[in-house]
Amino acid sequence: MKKLVFTFKRIDHPAQDLAVKFHGFLMEQLDSDYVDYLHQQQTNPYATKVIQGKENTQWVVHLLTDDHEDKVFMTLLQIKEVSLNDLPKLSVEKVEIQELGADKLLEIFNSEENQTYFSIIFETPTGFKSQGSYVIFPSMRLIFQSLMQKYGRLVENQPEIEEDTLDYLSEHSTITNYRLETSYFRVHRQRIPAFRGKLTFKVQGAKTLKAYVKMLLTFGEYSGLGMKTSLGMGGIKLEERKD
């Protein structure tokens, strides 16, 4: 898996709107047959997000499978300027590349991990759909279900998750602290209810369980969490903890 961070001089435009525009730009760079293929996938092999800083704007693209990386990576590296509909042409100031391999994830899983508390920062609006309805407050079950589905489909090529494992994870994890706010993500004319902020939870159980959680969350920093991660929703990062 690769992470590409495109840095621009700060763009004074809402990050959520930019994320959708950048996604449209990305699709324009790809072969139309491949774009059609992507639209048919149950879980997209990429995730994006836009992060606004004080002096710059970053467009982050995660390539989550080897096949998608082979088709997209070199195209992305050649991008020097970006045109987003009604905005002035944007010049790329720099591109940073990071990598997360399956071997690194396996190393985390096999480690003597004994971290009990984990903190997730929801950088972009994050949301779930359950039984046909939007969910604007996270539960541990929804968090783990999303991560396990993405990991299973994109890394292990397994379309279905193990419900027993999901049950066990959910039963042994408890939200201990949160600071969340309602946030809406607009896609064209649709406003999707979601949330942003920070959540801390505790995992009780064997070291193997805690290591599995750490592996899933590390993967989640690339895959995103919840729905519409290819459009810019569900961008997360882990907060480093000492306990």
From Swiss-Prot:
Record key words, sorted: Antiviral defense, Endonuclease, Hydrolase, Nuclease, RNA-binding
Taxonomy, superkingdom: Bacteria
One Pfam assignment: CRISPR_Cas6
Residue ranges the record marks as coiled coil: none
Keyword Ion transport listed: no
Disulfide-linked positions: none
GO biological process, one term: defense response to virus
EC number per UniProt: 3.1.-.-
GO MF, one example: RNA binding
Top EC category: hydrolase
Miscellaneous comment in the UniProt entry for this protein: Encoded in a type III-A CRISPR locus.
Description of how the protein assembles with itself and partners: Part of the Csm effector complex that includes at least Cas10(1), Csm2(3), Csm3(5), Csm4(1); the presence of Csm5 and Cas6 may depend on the processing state of precursor crRNA. Csm with a precursor crRNA does not include Csm5, while Cas6, the enzyme probably involved in pre-crRNA processing, is found associated with a subset of the Csm complex that is probably in the process of pre-crRNA maturation. The Csm complex is elongated and slightly twisted with a maximal length of 215 Angstroms and a diameter of 75-80 Angstroms.
Family recorded in the similarity comment: Belongs to the CRISPR-associated endoribonuclease Cas6 family.
Biological function: CRISPR (clustered regularly interspaced short palindromic repeat) is an adaptive immune system that provides protection against mobile genetic elements (viruses, transposable elements and conjugative plasmids). CRISPR clusters contain spacers, sequences complementary to antecedent mobile elements, and target invading nucleic acids. CRISPR clusters are transcribed and processed into CRISPR RNA (crRNA). Csm functions as a non-specific ssDNase. Base-pairing between crRNA and target RNA to form a ternary Csm complex activates a ssDNase activity; target RNA cleavage suppresses the ssDNase, a temporal control that prevents uncontrolled DNA degradation. Viral RNA transcripts probably tether the Csm complex to the viral genome, recruiting Cas10 ssDNA activity which is able to degrade DNA in the transcription bubble, spatially controlling the DNase activity.
Protein name as catalogued: CRISPR-associated endoribonuclease Cas6
Species the sequence originates in: Streptococcus thermophilus
